[in-house]
């Protein structure tokens, strides 16, 4: 049996009771180590808490060597630990598909993830649209497919959760070309970089999916003791020191509920100014007033 076990967001003790009991009975325990990190725990503290040795599973192992993870899983119990919830990344879905192809039974044990814990910032979960990812730009590569999804969300008034890039155990193009197995230091996108890249794409596209004054919420270290929120415009957040990782960003939709706005006031520098920007932003994508069709019988 292959068990995909969510670890939650921060502490080693965030795991569920069922998840912990399952780990203790598994023959091998892998920790997926490249789509996210636990902010208040590490491999050593996890091993001490679980009482088990943990095998780090990097991108190369998960995406290129899944057969090693699944080896004998038709007879032995194998645990695959994921920060957050097991279904927070497409990579984990792919692992399940490969297991099924080998007739290996799979069970998921869920936990909190950024996808549901984001509600802690005060925005209502059912007011969120499509989630998008924002990757680090390079001089020659600035993907902007996220822009269309933000546009779609804002056209129907919904908030957009942006997941910010994480680079762990990545190789430079130069080292890859030379065949050198040298990895770059880990990089975690901060709020300043995310907001700046969003503004750069709007400047390039000029389609007004958002503006420098579009209200957003910066979310830092969600679920940890150092969790913080900061509400402001994109322009303001492009100059905001968000501190240590991990970070996410929410761009507000047009339909901001009064309770949501009242909650966000706790995280703004200037309440009246933020309210003004929200009201101005609500005019974007505002549907035209309804005009009933002419009654042909009356016109006769």
From Swiss-Prot:
EC assignment: 2.1.1.314
A Pfam family matched in the record: TP_methylase
Keywords of the record: Cytoplasm, Methyltransferase, S-adenosyl-L-methionine, Transferase
Pathway given in the UniProt record: Protein modification; peptidyl-diphthamide biosynthesis
Known catalytic reactions: 2-[(3S)-amino-3-carboxypropyl]-L-histidyl-[translation elongation factor 2] + 4 S-adenosyl-L-methionine = diphthine methyl ester-[translation elongation factor 2] + 4 S-adenosyl-L-homocysteine + 3 H(+)
GO BP terms, alphabetized: methylation; protein histidyl modification to diphthamide
Cystine crosslinks: none
Positions annotated to bind S-adenosyl-L-methionine: 9, 85, 88, 113-114, 164, 222, 247
One Gene Ontology term of the molecular function aspect: diphthine methyl ester synthase activity
SUPFAM superfamilies in the record: Tetrapyrrole methylase
EC class: transferase
Subcellular location: Cytoplasm
GO CC terms in record: cytoplasm
Transmembrane segments annotated in the record for this chain: none
Entry similarity comment: Belongs to the diphthine synthase family.
NCBIfam families: dph5 (TIGR00522)
Function: S-adenosyl-L-methionine-dependent methyltransferase that catalyzes four methylations of the modified target histidine residue in translation elongation factor 2 (EF-2), to form an intermediate called diphthine methyl ester. The four successive methylation reactions represent the second step of diphthamide biosynthesis.
Protein's name in the database: Diphthine methyl ester synthase
Lineage: Eukaryota, Fungi, Dikarya, Ascomycota, Saccharomycotina
């Amino acid at each position: 049996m292959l068990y995909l076990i969510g670890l939650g967001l921060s502490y080693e003790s965030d795991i569920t009771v069922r998840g912990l009991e399952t780990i203790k009975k598994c023959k091998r325990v892998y920790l997926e180590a490249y789509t996210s990190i636990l902010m208040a725990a590490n491999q050593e503290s996890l091993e001490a808490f679980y009482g088990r040795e943990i095998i780090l599973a990097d991108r190369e192992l998960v995406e290129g060597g899944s057969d090693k993870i699944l080896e004998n899983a038709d007879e032995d119990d194998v645990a695959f630990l994921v920060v957050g919830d097991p279904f927070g990344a497409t990579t984990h879905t792919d692992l399940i598909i490969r297991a099924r192809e080998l007739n290996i039974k799979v069970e998921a044990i869920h936990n909190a993830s950024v996808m549901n814990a984001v509600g802690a910032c005060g925005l209502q979960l059912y007011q969120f649209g499509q989630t998008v990812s924002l990757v680090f730009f390079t001089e020659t590569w600035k993907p902007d497919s996220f822009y269309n999804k933000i546009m779609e969300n804002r056209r129907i008034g919904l908030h957009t959760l942006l997941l910010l890039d994480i680079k762990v155990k990545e190789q430079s193009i130069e080292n890859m070309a030379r065949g050198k197995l040298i990895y770059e230091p880990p990089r975690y996108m901060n709020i300043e970089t995310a907001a700046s890249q969003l503004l750069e794409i709007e400047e390039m596209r000029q389609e007004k999916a958002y503006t420098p004054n579009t209200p957003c919420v910066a979310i830092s270290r969600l679920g940890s003791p150092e969790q913080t929120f900061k509400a402001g415009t994109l322009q303001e957040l492009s100059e905001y020191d968000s501190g240590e990782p991990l970070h996410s960003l929410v761009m507000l939709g047009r339909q901001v509920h009064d309770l949501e706005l009242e909650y966000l006031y706790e995280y703004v520098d200037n309440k009246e100014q933020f309210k003004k920007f929200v009201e101005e932003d609500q005019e974007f994508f505002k549907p035209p007033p309804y005009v009933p069709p002419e009654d042909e019988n009356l016109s006769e």
